[in-house]
Regions:
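Alpha-helical segment of the N-proximal tetratricopeptide repeat
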Residues: 41-75, 114-129
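N-terminal leader/linker segments that initiate helical-solenoid repeat arrays
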Residues: 14-60
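Bacterial Sec-dependent N-terminal signal peptides
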Residues: 1-16
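Alpha-helical linker/edge segments of TPR/alpha-solenoid repeat scaffolds
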Residues: 45-46, 92-117, 157-181
């Protein structure tokens, strides 16, 4: 009898949580000094979070969509840590809740093109923070629209020149160091 109850409990828990998601850890923005104003950063974060939510729904929360979501949410939250869409999506995904499809201003082709254009502008501004965000945007753009030749070319040139983008520092902020008194 107790084995049956345990089975029912496990089955009920599985129904509530339809997928596992490892949320990005963002303690503070690494893009504070990036060459964008706060309104732009918030708009990019919102559109990225909406696109990500819609992709998760479209792809039924498969591993590819959840992997993309981890990177996209990390970028969105670094751009605008209090962005409503990004915070809500992160919460829902952590709980295993399928997000709602949302109306978006940008389809995949347009969003990827926007990211490539912004990345080119950020590269021209120079500085490590601008270049890091540019690399992130190119990486996301090539995932969003792998047929975008400008995104693919920029992505491949980045790999040749700099190697693969290390997402760890972006998706997994280190624990804060607490000094000894």
């Amino acid at each position: 009898m107790s084995l049956f109850l345990l089975f029912c409990f496990v089955l009920e828990a599985q129904e509530k949580r339809t997928f596992e998601f490892k949320a990005p850890i963002v303690r503070e923005s690494i893009f504070k000094e990036v060459g964008m104003n706060d309104r732009e950063k918030d708009a990019y974060a919102t559109n990225l979070a909406i696109f990500t939510a819609n992709e998760i729904v479209r792809m039924k929360a498969n591993q590819d969509s959840l992997g993309f979501a981890r990177k996209a949410l990390a970028v969105a939250m670094h751009l605008s840590p209090r962005n409503k869409r990004a915070v809500i999506l992160k919460f829902q995904l952590e709980k295993g809740v399928m997000p709602t499809t949302l109306e978006t201003q940008y389809g995949p082709k347009t969003l990827a093109t926007l990211f490539v254009t912004r990345a080119e502008f950020l590269y021209q501004q120079k500085g490590n923070v601008n270049r890091l965000l540019a690399r992130c945007l190119i990486d996301l753009a090539v995932t969003i629209d792998p047929r975008n030749e400008d995104a693919v070319y920029a992505y491949e040139m980045q790999k040749i020149d700099l190697g693969e983008l290390a997402w760890g520092p972006i998706t997994d902020a280190p624990k804060p160091v607490i000094p000894n008194p």
